[in-house]
Amino acid sequence: MTDYPIKYRLIKTEKHTGARLGEIITPHGTFPTPMFMPVGTQATVKTQSPEELKAIGSGIILSNTYHLWLRPGDELIARSGGLHKFMNWDQPILTDSGGFQVYSLADSRNITEEGVTFKNHLNGSKMFLSPEKAISIQNNLGSDIMMSFDECPQFYQPYDYVKKSIERTSRWAERGLKAHRRPHDQGLFGIVQGAGFEDLRRQSAADLVAMDFLGYSIGGLAVGESHEEMNAVLDFTTPLLPENKPRYLMGVGAPDSLIDGVIRGVDMFDCVLPTRIARNGTCMTSEGRLVIKNAKFAEDFTPLDHDCDCYTCQNYSRAYIRHLLKADETFGIRLTSYHNLYFLVNLMKKVRQAIMDDNLLEFRQDFLERYGYNKSNRNF
């Protein structure tokens, strides 16, 4: 690859950890890192307008290749002028490869060297996704950052299976690079796999780094392993990745996991967590999680989070938001979703300042002491 639509600029490494302060330059703008990326599965972040996402400070959003391929179709989106125009978002977009959804949503999967045959989860029809097809779909979507097609083995699968899987993923990555028809305006990332096996992560990283991708994703985590196991994998994986390229931890959105990922040198994160739990009335606050539907909030006229300056907390009370959710009013979900997204995007803003000030470990301790991390919050 001779041209570089995606560029990473390292501004500072924190003195006491591997945390990196930087920025990523894309064809649709520059965003600071570390950054949490809201997920817009169906070309929309659920209940949020583009204007609201900009007010939150979302410098980049993620959309899902698998879902947009099935509905409304990548060719239709291309005819509309590309995903940015289709959804009226003029800032950077990252698309995944569709691989994770194939393995997690689709039925009757059959994995071969050529690709994956599976049943469409919407109508049961037979579908086939190959490395070349995954790249073609993303080329049609026109995202700024694309992902190679990979297999995401379960964390506790046997060693021999995972070894064969990562070797196939490396061959798929090479095929995807060759199929990429828009290298001048779309950056392609490779995805490091290997479950919890250090030697396989090392092999996967070496294969992909040799292909000179514009960035590297760490896949196969946040799939049921413990927080400690995730950190252990990051401890031996991120040092294998080039310092001059972005590092992206896929599918992670719990506050402690974000901070611990940053400490280990990760630059980008995404997760559906903030909007998913918001729809059930669970809110992230500086004092821990808050389940707003609880009866004790029926006459609580204070904000969701006393330390939050988001639109929701500046204008609406716990009692009002609880009323909306109990009445099944969509506006309640909009308010809780806005708040949760703001909470994580703003957390990353505070993390960036802590890196600048060389006090990230102190920030982590103070944050988690207030947040009250325990087993009940661990998956939150």
UniProtKB/Swiss-Prot annotation:
Known partners and oligomeric status: Homodimer. Within each dimer, one monomer is responsible for RNA recognition and catalysis, while the other monomer binds to the replacement base PreQ1.
Organism classification: Bacteria, Bacillati, Bacillota, Bacilli, Lactobacillales
Full protein name: Queuine tRNA-ribosyltransferase
PANTHER family named among the record's database cross-references: QUEUINE TRNA-RIBOSYLTRANSFERASE (PTHR46499:SF1)
Family to which this protein belongs: Belongs to the queuine tRNA-ribosyltransferase family.
Gene Ontology molecular function terms on file: metal ion binding; tRNA-guanosine(34) queuine transglycosylase activity
Reaction it catalyzes: 7-aminomethyl-7-carbaguanine + guanosine(34) in tRNA = 7-aminomethyl-7-carbaguanosine(34) in tRNA + guanine
Keyword match Transferase: yes
GO annotation terms (biological process): queuosine biosynthetic process; tRNA wobble guanine modification; tRNA-guanine transglycosylation
Region annotated RNA binding, chain positions: 251-257, 275-279
